Amino acid sequence: MENIVLIKPHERITNTAQTSGMIRQAAVTPELCNNNGLWVGLVSAPPGSSGAHHHGDAESAIYIIRGKIRMYFGDNLETSLEAEAGDFIYVAPNTIHVEENLSSEEPVEFIVARNATSSLVVNVSE
């Protein structure tokens, strides 16, 4: 494993696990960095909502780069919070959630980091 690895935009992995309403691009992965235990990627979401999903036993940290989202979570997605550029969100393992882009015109972008070696997405039937 190299001590420092640079991942350029054109090197990101785009065929990662996906959820409707979201586009995930993997950057820090075993395939690109020969690392173990960490996945980091860029996510963009057009106006609208993602499908319901969770990330298994992985913890997730999200940093909003651009835009504003509402995240729904809870047993019946009854709880929500709003986050905007500059905010961080922590998502505990196995937490079912939905991200909603609050803009009607612009995509939202955020960085996601997980203690996993893949994007680890479990889509949930709605």
Give the residues covered by each predicted segment.
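Conserved hydrophobic/aromatic beta-strand scaffold that supports enzyme active sites
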Residues: V40-S44, A61, S80, F88-Y90, ...
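A short beta-strand-loop-beta hairpin characteristic of the jelly-roll/cupin
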Residues: H54-A85
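Short beta-strand His + acidic residue motifs that chelate non-heme Fe in jelly-roll/DSBH
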Residues: A52-H53, M71-Y72, S80, V91, ...
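A short, N-terminal "cap"/entry segment at the start of jelly-roll beta-barrel domains
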Residues: M1-G37, N123-E126
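Ligand-binding loop in jelly-roll beta-barrel domains
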Residues: E84-A85, P93-S119
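Conserved short histidine dyad/triad with adjacent acidic residue
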Residues: R24-Q25, T29, G41-G56, P93
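Short, charged/polar surface micro-motifs in flexible loops or helix N-caps
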Residues: L32-N36, A45-S49, R66-R70, S119
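Residue-level recognition of conserved beta-strand positions in structured domain cores
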Residues: L42, H54-G56, F73-D75, N101, ...
